[in-house]
């Protein structure tokens, strides 16, 4: 792969940068799972006016441009890993919340749920022992698509100069550095971009595979 303009080995920097890029993607997915599950489970299980109110909150959150939210968080918190994680968590949980709500609305009137309630189990026990385990399949599939989305978002922010700042090293910062030397050393941009592409594609294939494996219709 060669070296950059300062003589640093590009392959080493790409491998080192993968730790931060993939970590941001995974942590964003976990944050989306926690926030989205709590929010969506509350809306789907309680229902009624609270459900309508919480869903209007999601509609408002969806109306805010993602880039604007990330820029505002970057200005308020700073251009660091913490700011990136908070910004990505704020824009990634809504889809998970809607999915969890839909699963809970579908399952909460099933006979085994009614039997659990009739046996005297608490609401928390019904949610964590019966509803969530039966709804976890589609949620896991959705989270596998959240990881590449977060990696792309972080890379885009770093690429346009609004994400991580030196000495932090991610694929986005490497691509941003490579852009400045594109005419002289195009490999500085091409190799980080290639690894971003391969990683995003791999997670998308993983999501497709999990979706097929967990879809009960494919077992017929």
PLM regions: where:
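Alpha-helical transmembrane segments of integral membrane proteins
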Residues: 3-220
């Amino acid at each position: 792969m060669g070296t950059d303009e300062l003589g640093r080995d590009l392959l080493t920097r790409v491998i080192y940068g993968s730790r931060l890029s993939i970590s941001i993607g995974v942590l964003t997915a976990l944050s989306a799972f926690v926030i989205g599950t709590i929010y969506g489970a509350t809306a789907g299980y309680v229902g009624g006016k609270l459900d309508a109110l919480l869903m209007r909150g999601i509609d408002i959150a969806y109306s805010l441009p993602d880039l604007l939210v990330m820029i505002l968080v970057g200005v308020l918190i700073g251009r660091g890993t913490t700011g990136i994680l908070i910004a990505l968590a704020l824009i990634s949980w809504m889809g998970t919340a809607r999915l969890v709500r839909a699963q809970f609305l579908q399952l909460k009137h099933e006979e085994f749920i009614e039997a659990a309630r009739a046996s005297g189990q608490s609401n928390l026990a019904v949610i964590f022992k019966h509803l969530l385990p039966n709804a976890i399949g589609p949620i896991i599939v959705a989270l596998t698509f959240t990881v590449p989305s977060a990696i792309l978002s972080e890379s885009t922010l770093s690429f346009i100069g609004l994400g991580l700042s030196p000495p932090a090293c991610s694929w986005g910062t490497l691509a941003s550095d490579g852009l400045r030397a594109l005419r002289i050393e195009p490999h500085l941009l091409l190799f980080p971009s290639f690894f971003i592409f391969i990683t995003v594609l791999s997670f998308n294939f993983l999501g497709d595979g999990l979706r097929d494996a967990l879809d009960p219709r494919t077992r017929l």
